[in-house]
């Protein structure tokens, strides 16, 4: 048996937590905000006992270039340990991320004393290389929470895409 491993990254406010909850609802084990330093240990555990981790999603939050470099090294370690994984990147247009942060009345993690939009742009600069390497990019600009959950379910549920069956009598 092999493990199905997803590494989920993306812009703050693009829906990583919503994606994690959707995966949990469909039987995935989810680890949120795991430091890259622990990837090596996790890779060894998965390689040793893949049946213990049939479907594992690791949600990462890349907030600095050094974190990105650490994450990339950790992903290499996963691959070198024989663990196959896919990366999913969640994104949305800046104006939508801005609206989401304003609606939630929360500061952007990279904002500091600058404007909210500056924080979003700083994060985009840092995560762009990860987006370029992602296996799947999901644009959440036009999606609400339920739409994103449906999209994630269709992409990664065991049964494949969810379909509507209509029976007319």
Name every feature range the model reports, one short phrase each.
Residues 26-76:
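Conserved nucleotide-sensing/catalytic segment adjacent to the nucleotide-binding pocket
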Residues 83-128, 136, 140-141:
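A glycine- and Lys/Arg-enriched "phosphate-lid" helix/loop adjacent to the NTP-binding pocket
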């Amino acid at each position: 048996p092999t493990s199905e491993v997803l590494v989920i990254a993306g812009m703050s406010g693009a829906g990583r937590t919503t994606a994690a909850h959707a995966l949990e609802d469909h039987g995935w084990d989810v680890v949120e905000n795991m430091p890259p330093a622990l990837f090596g240990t996790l890779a060894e555990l998965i390689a040793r006992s893949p049946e213990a981790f049939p479907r594992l999603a690791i949600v990462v939050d890349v907030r600095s270039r050094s974190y990105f470099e650490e994450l990339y090294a950790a992903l290499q370690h996963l691959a070198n340990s024989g663990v196959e994984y896919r990366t999913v990147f969640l994104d949305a247009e800046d104006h939508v991320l801005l609206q989401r942060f304003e609606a939630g009345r929360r500061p952007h993690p990279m904002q500091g004393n600058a404007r909210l939009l500056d924080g979003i742009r700083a994060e985009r600069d840092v995560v762009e290389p990860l987006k370029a390497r992602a296996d799947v990019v999901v644009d959440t600009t036009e999606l609400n929470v339920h739409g994103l959950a449906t999209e994630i379910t269709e992409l990664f549920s065991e049964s494949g895409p969810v379909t509507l069956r209509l029976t007319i009598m």
